[in-house]
Amino acid sequence: MTDTKTSATTSTAPAGSKETVRTQIIESLADLRAWRAQTGSLWLKGQKAAKETRGGADSPRIGFVPTMGALHQGHLELVKRAKADCDVVVVSIFVNPFQFAPHEDFGKYPRTFENDLKLLSEMGCDLVFYPSEKEIYPRGKDSIMAVVPPSPLNDTLEGAFRPTFFRGVATVVLKLFNLVQPHVAFFGEKDYQQLQVVKALVEDLDVPVEIVGVPTVRESDGLAMSSRNAYLGAAERTEATSLYKALSLVKTMADAGKDVADATAAASLLLKEEKGWTLQYLSVCHGKSLAPLTQFQKPYVIVTAAKLGEVRLIDNIVVP
């Protein structure tokens, strides 16, 4: 049996709040299952003691935010939304090796657990699930039964450049859903194709979890918040704003009545004329199926991926 533990940390809430938050840390699947089995009764006992039951509700609404850690304001916005919509909030921190190709950055992906835990405690997160790779893939990631999304979602855009990515995402998300058993899960729209894969997963496989997409959180200069922004040097960080400028140009041309080909060509040229960019794709797609569009027709999404030096960035603009 894997040597695991369950621990907890207590953090005083931010200034202006009287709440003292107790964030529990669970590292093993066995402890998570035990927590999930008793969550309803413990929550109801606490609510009755505080005389705060919600219209006779006898079980908590559990919200779930799956992450790979290295948390930033974009992640915290997901937690904030979960806190507003749910009674109990669970955040997982697991850098999933199954979604990284051999040449990708699994080994150097930022791991900042202590800081992540501090942020989550301040946000009032109830539980952090922090498993090891051995807990999630006891026989190894190459021996697990995998979930492979259908080709239209799996093989285009991100999938064309990261062919194993969505298989890894879908597999670990389904496993986490089965373990946490949330009522609702929150994903950022910044990873738009991933969001559509997860929505298709729960719809096609009848997984009883509501999926909520939360709009992209941006820096003041428009750069989408991402854990990989930490890889950018000072000059690259300044240049990185060009990606959102390119997307915004497509949206501006769409609003002016231009067609997709002209708009994407102009935006692609903008990036090619800037220093250090290698454009991988810039496309206009249907908002749900991600089928490529030749004319702007709502709902649509403008999606792009490009490398700035050695750092790969993705972004999008959603037009509902």
Where are these regions (language model features)?
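Nucleotidyltransferase catalytic core that binds NTPs
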Residues: T2-W277, S283-A291, I317-V318
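A short, glycine/Asx- and small/polar-enriched loop/turn
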Residues: T294-P299
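Generic C-terminus detector
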Residues: V301, A305-K307, V311-P320
